[in-house]
Design a protein with these regions (language model features):
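Axial heme c-ligation environment in periplasmic c-type cytochrome domains
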Residues: 138-142
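Active-site substrate-binding loop specific to GH73 endo-beta-N-acetylglucosaminidase modules
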Residues: 1-137, 147-184
C-alpha cells in the first residue's frame, strides 16, 4: 500500500492505476495535461476521497478517472503505510467504488474485501494474470504466438480451476510447438 501512496497521505489514483493496469490488465492513456495534486493543506476539512473527486471532476479528467478512482477509493481504509483505518479527518471513510469491466458491466463494491472478492472472480483479472505469466516465462506477448492464444490459455486456466502449474505447462507447450513468425 505504501508504494502507491505519498509519504503522509494515500493516493487512490496511484492505487487505482496499479489495479487497473497490473491486476485487471487494462490500458490507460497518459493525462492530456500535467497537474499537481491538491495539497491537503488547501482543503484541511476534506478527506482524500473528497479532494480527489474535486480535482478529477472535469469531463476531460473523467475519461480515465471514471475507471481509476472507484478502484482506488475501495482501498481508502488503508492509510499511507497500509494500516487499517475507518476515519480520516474525523469523518467516516467512504470506501465504496465502481468499476466497468471490458464487457461494459458495472460492478459496485464497498471496501477492500468486496473489491478483492470481485477481482478473484473477474475475467479481466484472470486474463491479465495469464497474459503477465506468459510474458514472464516466454518473454513475448501471447499474440506473437497467434491471435487467439491469450483466449485459449485463459479458457484453459479457467477450465483447470485456475491451477497455476497447469497454466505453466500450457504456456510451455505453446512456446515449444508454435512458431511466432507464423502467427495468424
Amino acid at each position: 500500500m505504501s508504494g502507491m501512496s505519498y509519504h503522509d497521505a494515500t493516493s487512490p489514483i496511484h492505487r487505482g492505476v496499479f489495479l487497473i493496469r497490473f491486476i485487471l490488465g487494462r490500458t490507460l492513456r497518459p493525462p492530456n495535461e500535467a497537474f499537481s495534486p491538491l495539497s491537503p493543506d488547501l482543503h484541511p476539512d476534506l478527506t482524500t476521497r473528497e479532494r480527489v473527486t474535486l480535482q478529477s471532476s472535469p469531463d476531460n479528467c473523467q475519461v480515465c478517472h471514471s475507471k481509476i478512482n472507484g478502484l482506488g477509493f475501495a482501498l481508502e481504509n488503508f492509510d499511507a503505510v497500509g494500516r487499517f483505518r475507518s476515519q480520516e479527518r474525523a469523518k467516516t471513510l467512504d470506501s465504496t467504488g465502481k468499476y466497468v469491466d471490458r464487457d461494459g458491466n458495472e460492478v459496485s463494491f464497498s471496501g477492500p474485501r468486496e473489491l478483492a472478492e470481485y477481482i478473484i472472480s473477474s475475467d479481466d483479472a484472470h486474463r491479465a494474470f495469464v497474459n503477465r505469466a506468459f510474458q514472464h516465462f516466454v518473454k513475448h506477448p501471447p499474440a506473437a504466438f497467434g491471435l487467439h492464444t491469450l483466449d485459449e490459455l485463459t479458457n484453459a486456466f479457467r477450465k483447470n480451476n485456475f491451477n497455476i502449474n497447469e497454466l505453466i505447462v500450457e504456456i510451455a507447450i505453446i512456446a515449444a510447438t508454435r512458431d511466432p513468425s507464423l502467427s495468424e
